[in-house]
């Protein structure tokens, strides 16, 4: 393990050479740019869906009382489904998790732990995951809230884990700390299926959505 990463918290590890790092937002923007090459594709941002109904076609009611008609509808709201479909909402639990980004940690401090620019994720039920980005900044994620209430100090909450795993790095102030929702299911398997012949859904990736949502999207398409 020492040739890749070193920490007093971990005694052994498995190295997977088939995996890599990804910037989630850039990946999302890249997908959007590819979709927009198709002139029949339209992306609506900041457009809340109020309701929908299905007969021969699907009618989607969005904000400002605007209706959109479509042959098919795929519901992929995940943890943010709200009251759009209460049956689907009951199949998932929105759970909050947290990430901190550090831009002020000197390279010599990071070199104490990172031998190579790898991504690390542990096997805890509420796992810790962290990596160095392309600018050698530390991105550290972990923690969970099942109550939908954030800790009073998000950064301090994450630093408790950093102190155990990367001792000494917790003294540096985070550039930014944020929270977001993931949707978990009881059995931790994604919840995918159809409601009618022309309405489909996919949700509940239990923290693995970035890896498999593109595959699920192709399946539904």
Each predicted region: which residue ranges?
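Dinucleotide-binding Rossmann-like beta1-alpha1 core, especially the glycine-rich loop
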Residues: 1
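Glycine/charged-rich beta-loop-alpha catalytic/anionic-binding loops adjacent to active sites
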Residues: 9-14, 194-201
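Helical element adjacent to the flavin cofactor pocket in flavoenzyme catalytic cores
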Residues: 12-71
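Substrate-binding strand-loop-helix patch
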Residues: 22-23, 209-212
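General beta-strand recognition
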Residues: 59-61, 139, 200-201
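Internal hydrophobic alpha-helix adjacent to the cofactor/substrate pocket in enzyme cavities
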Residues: 161, 214-221
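Hydrophobic alpha-helical bundle architecture
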Residues: 201-208
